Structure formats: C-alpha cells, structure tokens
C-alpha cells in the first residue's frame, strides 16, 4: 500500500515537472518604459533586452531621438495587429539627419521562442528575415503562426484599453492589409526608467521619515529642556 502510494506520488511529481518544463516562461522585462501618446489614448510598453538586444537598442534609440513622434498606426486588424508605420515614411514631421540614419538601419532577425499573444511587440519585415527597420506591431490577439518568424522584443505594460479603442476604428482593406480610414497619430512619446522611479519613491519615504524623526526629537527636546 505504502509502495503504491509513493509510486503514484512520484509519477505525479514527474508529470508536474514535465508540464512545468513544457510551459513557456515569459522573459524578464527591462526597466525602461516607453509611452506612445496617441489620438486614442496612451500605450506604455517595455522591452525584452535578453531576447532581442539589437532590436531593443535600435527601437529605444529611435524613441530617444523622437523618431516616432508624429508617426502613425497604418494598419489595424481587429484581433490580430495594430502596426506602427516605418519612421522614414510614416511621420508627418520632417526628420533630422540623425533620425534618418537610425531609421534606415536594417536589423538582423532575432527570432525566439517567445509567443505572439495579445500585447506582444513584434518587428515588421519584408521576405528577407534581416530586413526589419522601424515598423512594428502590437498584437491584438494570439498569432501562433508568427512565432519564430518575426522578432518579439517587448510587450505592452499599460494601455490595453487604448488597443481596444483602436480595434473599433472603421477600416478598409487594401490587399492583405486592413487599414484605418482615419489617421491614428502618435502625437508624442516619452520614456522613463522604473528603477529610477523606485529610487525616487524610496528617497521620498526616507525624507518623510527623517522629517518625522526631526519633529519628534525637537518635541522631546522642548519637553525635557524647556
């Protein structure tokens, strides 16, 4: 009886371990966050620097250069993708030389086992696997047929309600693309570091504690040494 029970428990543990190994692990997000302020609301996203380091460096540099300001989502296919246009052709404002130089770079395809699910950020490209430049998609649903074919480099961290609003925009079909009938503009962008925010919060808490301690010391001093 005891042997049978132990055998069953052992098999159950092995099965659990096998399932755990089979389940995909979500990669760790870096501390950088980017916010796209669109005509339909804000979308915040983070990066997977250990999954697609070259892609992350390139996209984040374009953000820091202001490359995505005045760009737009040229494609919105409900339940599939909302795709940002290439910086070189999608902006309504002219580019400076530094922006243009970075936008025209081609990035090697960094394909991984990270799944294409809602909120995933995935690079656009042509047939050449190393032809990605600055266009990328925010997934609006699961798309397993894109797995290991397109480079995943991050995910949306806030603003899913904005993605839902984009899905309700009227669209028209042009060939394989489903495109919005109005321009969905990225009005402006900004970025911040979650580690720095955490440090600022800790400093603020410490400052309040020190101020409270000072008040208490002063109160005791006045009480004991009037």
From Swiss-Prot:
Transmembrane segments: none annotated. Ubiquitous. Lower expression in roots. Its EC number is 5.2.1.8. The keyword Isomerase applies. It is found in: Endoplasmic reticulum. The keyword Endoplasmic reticulum applies. Residues 34-191 form the PPIase cyclophilin-type domain. It catalyses: [protein]-peptidylproline (omega=180) = [protein]-peptidylproline (omega=0). Keywords: Chaperone, Endoplasmic reticulum, Isomerase, Rotamase, Signal. InterPro entries: Cyclophilin-like_dom_sf (IPR029000), Cyclophilin-type_PPIase_dom (IPR002130), CYP23-like (IPR044233). CDD domains: cyclophilin (cd00317). SUPFAM superfamilies: Cyclophilin-like (SSF50891). One of its GO terms (molecular function) is peptidyl-prolyl cis-trans isomerase activity. GO terms for cellular component: endoplasmic reticulum; endosome; Golgi apparatus; trans-Golgi network. Residues 1-22 form the signal peptide. It comes from the Eukaryota. Its main location: endoplasmic reticulum. It is an enzyme of class 5 (isomerase). PPIases accelerate the folding of proteins. It catalyzes the cis-trans isomerization of proline imidic peptide bonds in oligopeptides. Belongs to the cyclophilin-type PPIase family. This is Peptidyl-prolyl cis-trans isomerase CYP23. The gene is CYP23.
């Amino acid at each position: 009886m005891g042997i049978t029970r132990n055998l069953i428990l052992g098999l159950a543990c092995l099965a659990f371990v096998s399932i755990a190994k089979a389940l995909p692990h979500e990669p760790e997000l870096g501390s950088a966050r980017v916010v796209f302020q669109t005509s339909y609301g804000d979308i915040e996203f983070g990066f997977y620097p250990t999954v697609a380091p070259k892609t992350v460096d390139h996209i984040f540099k374009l953000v820091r250069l202001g490359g995505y300001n005045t760009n737009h989502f040229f494609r919105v296919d409900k339940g599939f993708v909302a795709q940002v246009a290439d910086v070189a052709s999608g902006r309504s404002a002219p580019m400076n030389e530094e922006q243009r130089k970075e936008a025209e770079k081609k990035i090697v395809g960094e394909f991984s086992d990270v799944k294409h699910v809602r909120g995933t950020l995935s690079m656009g490209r042509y047939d050449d696997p190393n032809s990605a430049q600055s266009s990328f998609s925010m997934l609006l649903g699961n798309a397993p047929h894109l797995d290991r074919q397109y480079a995943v480099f991050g995910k949306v961290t806030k603003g899913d309600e904005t993605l839902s609003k984009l899905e309700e925009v009227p669209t028209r079909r042009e060939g394989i693309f489903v495109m919005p009938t109005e321009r969905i503009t990225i009005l402006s962008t900004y970025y911040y570091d979650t580690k720095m925010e955490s440090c600022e919060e800790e400093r603020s808490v410490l400052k309040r504690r020190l101020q409270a301690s000072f008040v208490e010391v002063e109160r005791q001093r006045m009480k004991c040494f009037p």
